[in-house]
Amino acid sequence: HNDGVCVPRIRKLMDWSEYLQTLGEDSILLNPIFESDNHGYDTRDFKTIDCRLGTNEDFKEVCEDLHKHNVKIVLDGVFNHVGRGFWAFKDVQEKKWDSPYKDWFHISFDGNSCYNDGFWYEGWEGHFELVKLNLQNPAVVDYLLDCVKMWIEEFGIDGLRLDVAYCLDHNFMRRLRSFCEELKPGFALIGEVLFGDYNLIVNDEMLHSCTNYECYKGIFSSLNCMNMLEIAHSMNRQFG
């Protein structure tokens, strides 16, 4: 739960930057750091560091310190959904049909939510504390790209890990790829992918890489059982 108390915990990363450099680590991946309702994946504001971690200025100093030690920063980009406390969704809760943000989400005013909002909306995989964004709405895409631009220009981040990338609109990922490459050449996009054909989103137009859970599972299962059938099947399915 977000208690609203500001504690600069994120500054502790500066205690480890020299050690990371000593290890030869050249990048660090952070879980969601922006203001959220609870655990970080339920974002309230993409432009403000969560007060439980500190302030924007705290994170800016952390990024400068990590870069000084040749460590790049990859943030968790949670673009599929937001929290119920997200500013645009709160506007819809208040104004209903009259909200200019009602089309930012997948909403039906013919139903009701489990929170009795007076309208139904799509949550991520049935989790209604995670309100699904409408990534086919140009206004939503423009807003998210503006946030990414701010992260690059203000903090100097070097890449994004896209949460539940298998749920993201493909045209959105194409737009994000070209936008980031133009803004910062070499910017990395890594997708969280659980299943399916990874080649659909890991290509020259969308993501550079992804989390290959299928092969990860195949590797440890095959090695533990001393039976290479599972990893051979996964490798052949993906790359054969």
Pin down the residues of each PLM region:
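N-terminal structural segment of carbohydrate-active enzymes
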Residues: 1-72, 82, 87-91, 126, ...
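Conserved alpha/beta catalytic core and glycan-binding cleft of carbohydrate-active enzymes
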Residues: 90-92, 96-97, 173, 177-240
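An active-site-proximal structural segment forming one wall of the substrate-binding cleft
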Residues: 19-23, 65-71, 88-100, 104, ...
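Core domains of carbohydrate- and sulfate-ester-processing enzymes
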Residues: 69, 87-130, 218, 222-239
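Short, solvent-exposed turn/loop segments enriched in Gly/Ser/Thr/Pro and often Arg
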Residues: 28-38, 77-86, 163-169, 192-197
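Active-site neighborhood of glycoside hydrolase catalytic domains
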Residues: 121-199, 219-220
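Aromatic- and acidic-residue-enriched segments that line the glycan-binding/catalytic groove
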Residues: 39-51, 79-119, 178, 204-214
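Hydrophobic faces of well-ordered beta-strands that scaffold small-molecule active sites
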Residues: 28-30, 73-75, 160, 189-191, ...
